[in-house]
Amino acid sequence: MQATNQTFQKMYNRALVLRHVRRNERISRVDLSRALGLKKSSISNIVAELLEAGIISEREQGESSASGGRKPIFLEVNRQFCGFLGIEVQPNRYNAVFLDLAGRVLFQREGKVSTYRDGFEPSLEKIYEELAPLAEQTGLPVAGICLGVPGYVHPADGTILYSIPHGLENWRVSPRAQPWDVPVYVENDANCCAWGELMVHPNSGAVDFLSVLMEFQEENPRLQQDIGISTGFGVVINGSLYYGQAFNSGEFKSALWTRNNKSQVGIPDEQLLGIRENQDILDDYLTELLMNLSPIVSVMSPQRVVLCGDGRNLLPRISYLLESRLSDRFIGLAAQRGLFQPSIHAQHNVAIGAAGRLLETLFDQPRIGRSRYEMGVDWEYVLDRFSVPGSELV
């Protein structure tokens, strides 16, 4: 037991150092010791191992202190160590990004697929085939893949529990279809948007916010409703994504919805078919959505509500409705403090968040009882596979 505890403590301290180096671009060994409360000798040993493995690197020297002495050497995460592939897979299209270890987008690719015509896995194989040469050009090894899809998803075991757009039920993602022989994970598309926001604000601590993914639907024979709009939520509490007991947190149904409605709201289905062309229908939909958000915002008190997907472009209209129709409602009053914000990721929300989930969970602190690869690749896997040959870091 003592050996096990010592091993875990070593992994924990290593993760602390890596997490802190990632969050602070100009930090020295002395700064790490002060910030983390670890002995200088422990920091020196951990840093030496990470340098040998190639996962961090030394950059320019800082200025000497007033009392003289050696100039501090700053540390940074080696961006060229490995990368993560995030892919949004919709029935008619895909959007992919490749992130390095610092979270920079190295390439982005959009393409056409037809999962309802060709099948989901054959469509994935086509996507991988198109992305393989782009990933190779970066010179970085692919360490993991995360797929962002619409529907109910078990994020830990890679199962799409139920996806109407893709026609899938209890479908387990297979790593065999991709050429890199790396773990493949799956995440709900709205939750991916939340992961993307967490990646952008790694120093924000225990934040509470909602990500709202709104997308105009394209024609799809598998959809219960031909063309319309869909909305999903990602819920972040105390800096962590909230999934709910059945992994369906964030699946939206309006208080005005009835069982005969194929959509998510109380507006008749036949009216929603014209939502793109008819401003009045769009306003009615947004008003109903905002009215449903009002008690959630009142109870949860989130710091922000981030609009993603097509919702990002609807912010001016949402602001207008909050200032006119809903000005005397709680949601209208709450919006006056800048509650609603557009995501900075534009149309790449889901793909960046999918890759961001792997990046964020990699730099998360290890927990006793967490299974290997529970939510993403861990340092044990990454170091074992990609560290500099001959290094002894385990």
Short names for language-model regions:
Residues 100, 155, 236:
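Short, acidic, Ser/Thr-enriched surface-loop or helix-capping motifs
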Residues 150-152, 215-217, 311:
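Short glycine-rich anion-binding loops that position phosphate/pyrophosphate groups of nucleotides
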Residues 108, 119-120, 174, 182-284, ...:
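Glycine/GP-enriched mid-protein hinge/lid loop-to-helix segment characteristic of carbohydrate kinases
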Residues 1-60, 66-69, 74-112, 116-126, ...:
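ATP-binding/phosphotransfer module of carbohydrate and carboxylate kinases, centering on a glycine-rich
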Residues 65, 105, 154, 193, ...:
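Flexible, glycine-rich phosphate/dinucleotide-binding loops
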Residues 105, 110-208, 316-332:
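Glycine-rich phosphate-binding loop and adjoining helix at the ATP-binding site
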Residues 74, 84-88, 142-146, 209-213, ...:
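Short glycine-aspartate micro-motif
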